[in-house]
Amino acid sequence: MSQYVICALYKFVALDNFEALRAPLLEVMEKNEVKGTLLLAREGVNGTVSGTREGMDALLAWLKSDPRLADLSYKESYDENIPFYRTKVKLKKEIVTMGVEGIDPKRVVGTYVKPQDWNALITDPEVLLIDTRNDYEVQIGKFKNAINPNTETFREFPDYVKSNLDPAKHKKVAMYCTGGIRCEKSTAYLKELGFEDVYHLEGGILKYLEDVPQEESTWEGECFVFDNRVAVDHSLNKGSYDQCHACRMPISAEDMQSEHYKKGVSCPHCYDKVSEDQLRRFAAREQQIELAKSRGEEHIGSEAAKAIKKRQAEKKLKRKNYHQHLTQGAE
């Protein structure tokens, strides 16, 4: 088994003291060398983190010791490397940003559909299947016959619904996302608008890929994930996509053959959208990344900070020894 556990977790629950949870949560993560980002808001917790089995178990035990989070939803996958550089806990207005006041998945939400029942639902000709993710995510993988709303952010989803969906016309609507959290809000939003039969994939794409054998699957392509793996395949292993360090878009092997691709600087998605100053900064950053790699170090994050401190200490010791040598030679 791979050395590191990657855990995507969330829970919609009233956390009136969410600000006070930040410091102890960050302390637990740092103590157990768990990296990644967790978001805290009055409406709950959300994020993806990674660490050793022992570290993740310690974090989950701490979270679940709070009765409000005892049944939080989480999904695990594994990799040889931790796909994050830093450890962060952020305070937010929403744990997933839709930007619509009054939407509360704790009060009303769509019907959860288990992964093993999903295929039967979405092959029903009366069901409208919608991917609630961003366009760049949909481009690298989706369920067969799913509609792409072509949104750049989740904030745009309500406008898509208002312009394209009608409760009187669309009697059955099924939606899905990466891990389930966006669908908690999107189905709650549709229910508030008067849509009656609204369904969503419990646990999201990641749970479907885990539970449904590939030979029975209706999933096409890979699944984008918000960490350094970029995407995962049907076995939840790191996929074939890389990421442009300039625009953060997923890039394929074909993209990297483009004349517009320059590692760490530009890709076919962004080459005509960046300034000369940005290109120079991206090129300088890529040089620093390659320099760090040549030393066997990370270029950012806590490990990079440790490496810098170590080099500084070594230089200081070297200077001290040099001055001692000069002093002894003069005596």
Curated annotation (Swiss-Prot):
GO terms for biological process: tRNA modification. CDD domains: RHOD_YceA. The active site is at C177. Its EC number is 1.14.-.-. Keywords: Oxidoreductase, tRNA processing. It comes from the Bacteria. One of its GO terms (molecular function) is oxidoreductase activity, acting on paired donors, with incorporation or reduction of molecular oxygen. It is an enzyme of class 1 (oxidoreductase). It catalyses: uridine(34) in tRNA + AH2 + O2 = 5-hydroxyuridine(34) in tRNA + A + H2O. Residues 293-331 are annotated as: Disordered. Pfam families: Rhodanese (PF00581), UPF0176_N (PF17773). PROSITE patterns: RHODANESE_3. InterPro entries: Rhodanese-like_dom, Rhodanese-like_dom_sf, TrhO, TRHO_N. Residues 307-323 have a biased composition (Basic residues). Residues 123-217 form the Rhodanese domain. HAMAP family: TrhO. Belongs to the TrhO family. Catalyzes oxygen-dependent 5-hydroxyuridine (ho5U) modification at position 34 in tRNAs. PANTHER family: RHODANESE-LIKE DOMAIN-CONTAINING PROTEIN 7-RELATED, THIOSULFATE SULFURTRANSFERASE/RHODANESE-LIKE DOMAIN-CONTAINING PROTEIN 2. This is tRNA uridine(34) hydroxylase. It comes from Hahella chejuensis (strain KCTC 2396).
